[in-house]
């Protein structure tokens, strides 16, 4: 079996990390596999196929297409960080995929002008599309805009020419199977006009094995010492730490930093430390510090993420929408309780008042209540054990990988039988 995994990047963002973990797991199980990406993320030395070839003319052409789409989004007033048509795709990508001749093509996050819907139609191999947001079945939004700015884009989805075109083009791709990491997004995909006739499967993302190996019962000051020695951040040893992770907490409104800020104002912050980690934009880091002066900020490399969670007493994920949140996944794997809103797939990971707290959607008062409830819990080790056991018992890496392998194998078998009947 020959599998080609396709995703925009390989490291940055939840979809990239999930796709890359699956890719690495396939290789570890002797499954012939490649990962095709558009943007190279530093630090990855795995064998991959690249779209942006070492050809200045192709690179120039792809950059021109990206600029054209960005201009179109600007003219139409669409939010660049939450909307993508991917009209043009990348030059020659469908041919590149078909030349590799895979048995299965596993799509993940392929917007951002990586693959156009017409490129997807041209792929000859059966497709398994692991959906990480609404884009595959929406009119272009990744997160419905009514979650972010109060406007409702869902009412006119079926009226847009682009949606009708997208539905029409994808209808020609009969051998397309949908995989949903969360039951929540799976139910939405099943009821969508674009995917209502496709086969659907629920397979959560594979957890990180090294996080599960982290000693979650060790003294938190040990992790704080590691972060200090590596010049990441100096967290106080005499205060409990609440951690919030996001690469772009201000420009990516979906991360819910505005709601966290309001909730933090309702917490007796002099007794606790808020750690804002993962910020990769200096302007946004400065902005966050101006709003919450007593917060600690840091850019955390993926290699030190386990220690970041390990130094925390709880992790808060105040997103407006989540599918199957990587942040929640990682925090629970490291044995840290999580406070988040009861939205999306969050309740598939967080059991209310067992391994964390599910606040009423977008209620900063209840978010603050959740933070205080965890920090004041009489037996924090109980919450930490429950957090880790949730992942160990219900999200086994081996079982989830087996689900993917069985799905891939069944699709290959069906495809081979259809080919024989055609002959």
PLM region spans:
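Conserved donor-binding/catalytic core segment of Leloir-type glycosyltransferases
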Residues: 179, 233-255, 261-264
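Nucleotide-activated donor-binding/catalytic signature segment of Leloir-type glycosyltransferases, i.e.
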Residues: 278-303
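Aromatic "clamp/platform" in nucleotide-sugar-dependent glycosyltransferases that forms part
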Residues: 320
């Amino acid at each position: 079996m020959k599998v080609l995994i396709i995703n925009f990047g390989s490291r940055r963002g939840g979809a990239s990390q999930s796709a890359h973990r699956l890719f690495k797991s396939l290789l570890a199980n002797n499954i012939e596999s490649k990962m095709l990406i558009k943007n190279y993320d530093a630090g990855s030395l795995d064998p991959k196929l690249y779209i942006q070839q070492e050809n200045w003319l192709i690179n120039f052409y792809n950059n021109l297409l990206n600029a054209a789409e960005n201009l179109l989004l600007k003219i139409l007033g669409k939010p660049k960080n939450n909307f993508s048509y991917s009209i043009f795709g990348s030059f020659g990508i469908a041919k590149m995929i078909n030349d590799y001749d895979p048995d299965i093509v596993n799509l993940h996050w392929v917007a951002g002008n990586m693959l156009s819907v017409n490129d997807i139609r041209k792929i000859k191999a059966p497709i398994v599309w692991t959906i990480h947001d609404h884009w595959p079945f929406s009119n272009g939004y990744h997160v419905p805009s009514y979650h972010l700015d109060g406007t409702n884009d869902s009412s006119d989805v079926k009226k847009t020419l682009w949606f009708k075109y997208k539905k029409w083009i994808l209808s020609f791709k009969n051998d397309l199977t949908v995989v949903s990491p969360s039951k929540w997004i799976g139910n939405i995909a099943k009821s969508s006009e674009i995917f209502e006739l496709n086969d659907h499967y629920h397979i959560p993302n594979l957890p990180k094995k090294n996080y599960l190996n982290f000693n979650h019962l060790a003294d938190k000051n040990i992790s704080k010492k590691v972060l200090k020695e590596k010049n990441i951040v100096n967290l106080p040893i005499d205060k409990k730490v609440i951690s919030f992770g996001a690469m772009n907490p201000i420009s990516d409104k979906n991360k819910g930093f505005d709601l966290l800020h309001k909730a933090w104002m309702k917490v007796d912050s002099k007794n606790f430390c808020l750690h804002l980690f993962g910020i990769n934009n200096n302007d946004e880091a400065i902005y966050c510090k101006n709003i919450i002066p007593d917060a600690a900020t840091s850019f955390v490399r993926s290699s030190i993420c386990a220690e970041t969670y390990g130094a925390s007493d709880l992790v808060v994920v105040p997103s407006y929408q989540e599918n199957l949140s990587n942040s929640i996944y990682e925090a629970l794997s490291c044995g840290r309780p999580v406070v988040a809103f009861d939205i999306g797939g969050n309740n598939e990971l967080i059991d209310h008042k067992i391994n964390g707290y599910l606040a009423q959607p977008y209620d900063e008062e209840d978010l603050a209540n959740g933070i205080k409830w965890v920090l004041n819990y009489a037996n924090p080790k109980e919450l930490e054990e429950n957090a880790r056991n949730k992942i160990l018992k219900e999200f086994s890496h081996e079982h989830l990988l087996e689900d993917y392998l069985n799905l891939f194998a069944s699709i290959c078998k069906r495809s081979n039988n259809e080919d024989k009947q055609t002959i």
